[in-house]
Amino acid sequence: MEDVNQEKKKVPPMSEPERSTPIKTTGGQYRFCKSCVEGSSCRTVRSRTKLMNVLIERGRPHEAQTVFKTLAETGHRPSLISYTTLLAAMTVQKQYGSISSIVSEVEQSGTKLDSIFFNAVINAFSESGNMEDAVQALLKMKELGLNPTTSTYNTLIKGYGIAGKPERSSELLDLMLEEGNVDVGPNIRTFNVLVQAWCKKKKVEEAWEVVKKMEECGVRPDTVTYNTIATCYVQKGETVRAESEVVEKMVMKEKAKPNGRTCGIVVGGYCREGRVRDGLRFVRRMKEMRVEANLVVFNSLINGFVEVMDRDGIDEVLTLMKECNVKADVITYSTVMNAWSSAGYMEKAAQVFKEMVKAGVKPDAHAYSILAKGYVRAKEPKKAEELLETLIVESRPNVVIFTTVISGWCSNGSMDDAMRVFNKMCKFGVSPNIKTFETLMWGYLEVKQPWKAEEVLQMMRGCGVKPENSTFLLLAEAWRVAGLTDESNKAINALKCKDIEIAKLEKLYQKQSSGSSFNLLQIPVGKRELPTAKAMNLSACKLGARVPIICQKQSQAQFGISGQFVHSCTVFLS
């Protein structure tokens, strides 16, 4: 209602300089909006400002900026609400550099400022951590006779927390309490923001002091309050205290009961600490309290049991999911499938894949890549390529699965097949990356055809992919393995980075050459059981720190997957 009243206020008429600058319309005519020139409320400005708010709410703040620009371009003058909304759009996008200029523009226009505008300014500065300018805005606000609200102080408290100064946040709370003004009294958000500020610095005891003061002021801590402190304990590696000190208090509170978020915080903490059994125990405890874990929680448990090679634990989680009527998605299937695949149990992995399709869950490129990678490890590149063909028909394969299949043929020494898949990749419109080219170069190294590796390097440049130091080192090794030392030295000399310790690298090559082969993928050895996270990762190319098949993002995603599992999944673990 306050916004509506603000919009109806008479806007100052355009100044003489503004009047003297005509605006060209799409029809080629020059005009001004009569309402804007006279300082009256303009319907167009109101409607476009409303549109800006809608765009921000829908997560499209950049479009809100564009709408704002069209106001002036079409002969309209933005209102104070327009500028306030623009500030909100800039803040969401973290474009803090223009805040001061926007404030100056509004002040120069002669528009009468209000507390809503100043709150937006203070919020923008606070979000950026620029508390000096945020405080200056507060002082200017008071100079103009505008009273700060509880929201104003909450924003400043949050800002000092962002700036890593919770002590100043506490001082502001004390100031609010000392003033005794009902209009600016602390509320639940005030205290929660301050708790968050202390927890950000991992000062749990200070956070508990805020909770104590909160209760003394007659404000009841809520679930957000306790979840924030629980998160702090988890980040400190003290998940046991999160359960014993935080959750126990929540259980006793009427209006701050544990929820799904609480469950996720504690279970995630136990899993990160390697105490997956405690995580499973906690989920069962929450189930008894009718707080059911969500998909993320269950998948964290599955992933945790995979890392500690506990197949019985995985089975227990899947059974519990069935009891909770939680269904699987592609990520959960991928987690279990990856465990079997990495351990070398390709029949089990393929069975999980079939069950996923049977359950109506559509495999994504990552799921296909996991299975293809397993076949490559098992020296079955033909099956890996069959998966690729299926993916081409049903979806769109990415560079990862193409490179995985190429590496499979390279591992078998079938370079004609590797190049055939490479050409298919290009024909399909998937751009090869440096890992693709280095995989081919490694393949030619294995079959002792360094001149072919040289051709791949030229092809790489032709595709606009810039070679890296590892590329030249790979080429040098290809020539060296073929017994052509002079050509190897030429490749090393082509390195642009002169600070590389060539002697150390050559020593590394000598050590690696003592092995039977230059393996691109690490084949599981020893006991055929669920591997640890490290064992499940593809090994780096032997020439250096490069993972040839899986990009960093996907490699991380393998062990940070979240999701859920179907009722029939337990059969795969028997």
Curated annotation (Swiss-Prot):
Keywords: Repeat. InterPro entries: Pentatricopeptide_rpt, TPR-like_helical_dom_sf. SUPFAM superfamilies: TPR-like. Residues 1-21 have a biased composition (Basic and acidic residues). Disulfide bonds: none annotated. Residues 1-25 are annotated as: Disordered. PPR repeats lie at residues 44-78, 79-113, 114-148, 149-183, 187-221, 222-258, 259-293, 294-328, 329-363, 364-394, 398-432, 433-467. PANTHER family: OS01G0228400 PROTEIN (PTHR47931), PPR CONTAINING PLANT-LIKE PROTEIN (PTHR47931:SF1). Belongs to the PPR family. P subfamily. This is Pentatricopeptide repeat-containing protein At5g25630. The lineage of its organism: Eukaryota, Viridiplantae, Streptophyta, Embryophyta, Tracheophyta.
